[in-house]
């Protein structure tokens, strides 16, 4: 039967992967990833679980089968004891040089699920810590959640996979903005009272990742689709996306009744990023950050300030941002994350009063 399915990697995702030899070949090496059991318990009523793992040289002298079986079976017993079962456990025992057809990201291991159409492509995901897991998802035509114990842990994965709606008795705070110019064609959708998987595609990979940070740390869900004149450069794509996103956020907020309005976060991450925000209806922007590099990936560092300035003016917000550190990638990422965290405070609904003595925001 077709149903939502999670194809889950084992080493580095369900259990810790030792960086010394990348083998869990004894009970002493068996260690569950943090909060994996509570997460799977929350997900099990909504998804089928399928474990998919590459185990290099399994059954050879370099990795005897019995050395694998003891910790593997112990792990399964722990999961079973907590009510967690896997529909299938699919393992490729080959090494990369064997050039087999079943090693991830190839899809032969999942032939049954593909041929019998057992998974719902629109609501199925690959969860894993490696680039091969992301590629597996692409080969299956589904989405990937690249697990990371700090950036995308099991708690955040649950948030993305189990959208939550507001308990307040008010219409959902949703907005859709379409912005078309000679340079760009953009569609932005925001759901301020939901979390879930964000669909973001601008053609600028690093920028996509940064936009996802805003929604993830902002505690809301958004879709951003942009087709821009990237054969020139990414300027119009970044600027126009910011304008559309700011407009969508402003529209979704509606009359702003019950929101906190103010937010601040400091410091955040190793880069000491700081943000203060007021959804005042009066745009103002102040930015302090210096970058050594011209580009991070395919993203011009100078566009960081321009992005936030554009979003502040269409969101009609007072926004102060600054960061300092050594790594330009980390500094830019810290600004997007701290913006999301601060926005999360501002848009949180706590009642029905308008947070202004003027009676309007």
From Swiss-Prot:
Keyword Magnesium set for record: yes
UniProt keyword Hydrolase, yes or no: yes
Region (Histidinol-phosphatase): 1-172
Enzyme Commission number(s) from the entry: 3.1.3.15, 4.2.1.19
Main subcellular location: cytoplasm
Gene3D superfamilies named in the record: HAD superfamily/HAD-like, Imidazole glycerol phosphate dehydratase, domain 1
Cofactor: Mg(2+); Zn(2+)
Reaction(s) this enzyme catalyzes, per UniProt: D-erythro-1-(imidazol-4-yl)glycerol 3-phosphate = 3-(imidazol-4-yl)-2-oxopropyl phosphate + H2O; L-histidinol phosphate + H2O = L-histidinol + phosphate
Biological process terms in GO annotation: L-histidine biosynthetic process
TM stretches of this protein: none
Molecular function, one GO term: metal ion binding
Annotated Zn(2+) binding sites: 92, 94, 100, 102
Subcellular location: Cytoplasm
SUPFAM superfamilies to which the protein is assigned, alphabetical: HAD-like, Ribosomal protein S5 domain 2-like
Pathway connected to this protein: Amino-acid biosynthesis; L-histidine biosynthesis; L-histidine from 5-phospho-alpha-D-ribose 1-diphosphate: step 6/9; Amino-acid biosynthesis; L-histidine biosynthesis; L-histidine from 5-phospho-alpha-D-ribose 1-diphosphate: step 8/9
Region (Imidazoleglycerol-phosphate dehydratase): 173-361
GO cellular component: cytoplasm
UniProt-annotated catalytic positions: 9 (nucleophile), 11 (proton donor)
Chain sites annotated for binding Mg(2+): 9, 11, 129
Keywords: Amino-acid biosynthesis, Cytoplasm, Histidine biosynthesis, Hydrolase, Lyase, Magnesium, Metal-binding, Multifunctional enzyme, Zinc
Cited NCBIfam families: HAD-SF-IIIA, hisB_Nterm, Histidinol-ppas, PRK00951.2-1, PRK00951.2-4, PRK05446.1
Family: In the N-terminal section; belongs to the histidinol-phosphatase family.
Protein name stated in the entry: Histidine biosynthesis bifunctional protein HisB
Species in which this protein is naturally found: Actinobacillus pleuropneumoniae serotype 3 (strain JL03)
């Amino acid at each position: 039967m077709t149903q939502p399915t999670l194809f889950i990697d084992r080493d580095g995702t369900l259990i810790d992967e030792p960086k010394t030899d990348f083998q869990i070949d004894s009970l002493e090496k068996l260690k569950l990833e943090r909060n994996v059991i509570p997460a799977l318990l929350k997900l099990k009523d909504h998804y089928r679980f399928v474990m998919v793992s590459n185990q290099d040289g399994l059954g050879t002298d370099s990795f005897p089968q019995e050395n694998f079986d003891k910790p593997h079976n112990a792990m399964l017993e722990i999961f079973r004891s907590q009510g967690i079962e896997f529909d299938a456990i699919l393992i490729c025992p080959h090494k990369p040089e064997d050039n087999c057809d079943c090693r991830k990201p190839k899809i032969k291991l999942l032939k049954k699920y593909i041929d019998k159409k057992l998974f719902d492509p629109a609501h199925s995901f690959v969860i894993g810590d490696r680039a091969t897991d992301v590629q597996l998802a692409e080969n299956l035509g589904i989405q990937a959640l690249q697990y990371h114990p700090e950036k995308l842990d099991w708690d955040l994965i649950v948030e993305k996979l189990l959208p939550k709606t507001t308990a307040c008795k008010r219409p959902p705070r949703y907005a859709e903005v379409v912005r078309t110019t000679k340079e760009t064609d953009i569609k932005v959708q925001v759901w301020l009272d939901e979390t879930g998987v964000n669909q973001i595609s601008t053609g600028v990979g690093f920028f996509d990742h940064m936009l996802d940070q805003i929604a993830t740390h902002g505690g809301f869900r958004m879709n951003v689709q942009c087709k821009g004149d990237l054969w020139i450069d990414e300027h119009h794509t970044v600027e126009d996306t910011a304008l559309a996103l700011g407009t969508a956020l402003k529209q979704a907020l509606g009359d702003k009744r019950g929101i906190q309005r103010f937010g601040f976060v400091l410091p955040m991450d190793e880069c000491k990023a700081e943000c203060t925000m007021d959804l005042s209806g009066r745009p103002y922007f102040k930015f302090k950050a210096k970058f050594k590099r011209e580009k991070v990936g395919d993203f011009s560092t100078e566009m960081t300030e321009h992005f936030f300035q554009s979003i502040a003016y269409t969101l009609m917000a007072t926004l102060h941002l600054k960061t300092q550190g050594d790594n330009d990638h980390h500094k830019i990422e810290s600004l997007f994350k701290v913006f999301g965290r601060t926005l999360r405070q501002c848009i949180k609904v706590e009642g029905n009063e308008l947070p202004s003595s003027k009676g309007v925001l």
